[in-house]
Amino acid sequence: MNQSLRNLAGSLAQLPGGRRTKFAVIAVWLVVLFAIGPLAGKFEDAQENDPADYLPANAESVQALDQLDGFPSDDEADAITVFHRDGGLTAEDRAAIEQVRAAINDEVRGEINAERSGTVAETGPPLISSDGATALLTTPITVPEAASGDAEDLLTDTPEEIKAELDSLPSGLEAEVTGPAGFSADAVEVFNDINGTLLLATGALVLLLLIVIYRSPIFWIIPFFSVLIAEVTTRGLGYLIADAGVTVTGQSGGILPVLVFGAGTDYALLMVSRYREELRRREDKHDAIRVALNRTSPVILASGGTVIAALLTLSLAEVSGTAGLGPIGAMGIAIAMLAMLTILPALLTVAGRKAFWPFIPRVGTEGADETHGAWRRVAEWVARGPRRVWIGTIAVLAVMAAGLVFLNSDLTTGNMFRDDVDSVQGQELLEAGFPAGANAPTNVVVTDTSKLDGVREAVAEAPGVAEVSPEVERGPGGAKLEVTLDEDPYSTAAFDLIPGIRQAAEEVAGDDVLVGGPTAEEYDLRQSAARDNRLIVPIALVVVFLILAALLRAIVAPLVLIATVILSYFAALGVGAFFFENVFDFPGMDPALPLFAFVFLVALGIDYNIFLMARVREETLTHGTRDGTIRGLAVTGAVITSAGLVLAGTFSTLAVLPLVSLTEIGFTIAVGVLIDTFIVRSLLVPALVLEIGDPVWWPSALARGAGPRPDERATGRIAMEPES
């Protein structure tokens, strides 16, 4: 490990390991907690979940939105109330619909407009379908761009108020609220419940795992409290970062606590494992924690730094939601790492060895590391036939990766909920009597109005266009046409229509026309996400390779590690795609999932490989590559496996949430971590290192061989040591 990391570790060890300074460390963290804690509760308020907020400024749909500034319908979103009866609406139904309309205009509109600065416009007469079975009431809602948070609640509160007027409808008459405002209300309701649910689920799981791992009724409190402080601090600083302009979405807000709990607990496991070993060697707990910090801090700093660097590559993304996850996630890892290297060891020192009751580590006793025997047997089994092992594991990973044939990116705003929410049910009712795109028309903005008629005719002939509105809305930026599509405006089929509409309009008006609206925004978002994949994936690999090369002082070993993690990634994505299609029956995969999964699995997979290979390199210096690999795997197996189970468990808690995208992210990363823990790190990496031999350390001096000590060369035995 680099000398600079060791120097930093030595400096860190003096604070939480000091007889007086340990209390100062705890006091500083408590001050930070009380200062930042109140901001943590505001973290959800800083989240943005409108696709238009994620797009780069040069996206055509964003330019169209900017061009509409000053139009009568600027900043307007509709709440569409859909009524439907199989066989046709009755006279009683139509009378009830008129009563609902009157209630919206008199009670809902009057009450909301009196309390907020936004505007709920008058709801016009119902639009009846040609078959007489479906009716629509459209309620325009306008929220000024600079409106307060109270005014912005119009988009969520108005649909809820309208729903309250639907309780007394005639039997058999179905009614739901949909449209952009309806989808917004459902999304906000789901995202508002995410953070509390996720925090409870993640915290409960980590608590349970800590109790099982340490088999102590009290010791779990120390690492759990340390991780909880890191999580609260991260959320508070996350609010400040979001307030400074970094985009935080509900998705990244859901991932953040999982990342902090998982990584923080992993680092805690490594620290506690070494501290417990040192308590068996040293009577003074202060000496024990200082040695433990000196030996584990460089590895934790190196692995955490690698994860931070990988996450920061997300900052290069065009999609601001993805770019925002970079600094937010990196900050979470940094705080978790800092907490586990400061307040955790300080609390461990204050508590002393009695905190481990009933399994108290005493000086001179043997280490209670029963799994070392099992992991030594695994290591020696790999060493007896490394070629057989790496060929077999690659074959298994290839079979898992074959699930990629089920990969599709059909998950959209319209089907992102795991449960049938009102807006989705309303869309289904709407499609029974109207073109599917009536829910959210596509906007065509013509800046040169002399070309308006030509654009209208060209767009009307474009594939997938049901109709172009006869009304023309005019404003400072030109004129706007509303285009209704044949497809659900939030479906991939509708997204695929946008290029044809743009081409048809541009053939007539050139640069004087822009196509926007919800469907175009989703299309542009997917295009930007694809661009982000092409840019960030190779950059992340190069960054991780350079860090590994510096840490291991080699080129071959980092290439081997990166290759194995890439295999692990494709295997995890393949397993995920298979389960999403054939077991969970999800409509598709989130387009952002491959990039998120890649960055997280590369970062976290390399994380565990650093834990392993740092020890292997250390052992190789004395025992040679073969014996060093066996020793390294044997003495790190138990703690890294525990860490992998904790991290996989924390990511699996995302599955409790009602959003398909977060469930997919949690499942894929959890599977990937388990693959990396039990297959890649335990079998594939050691087998490849043993197969390659000393050249794996090229171009360092180790590539020329560093044989074992003479006494071990003579006996052929490999002496086991406690983990360091």
What are these regions (language model features)?
Residues 77, 200, 331, 391, ...:
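A generic structural-conservation signal
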Residues 57-76, 86-181, 406-588, 610:
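Structured non-transmembrane domains adjacent to transmembrane bundles in polytopic membrane proteins
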Residues 48-51, 412-413:
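Short hinge/gating elements
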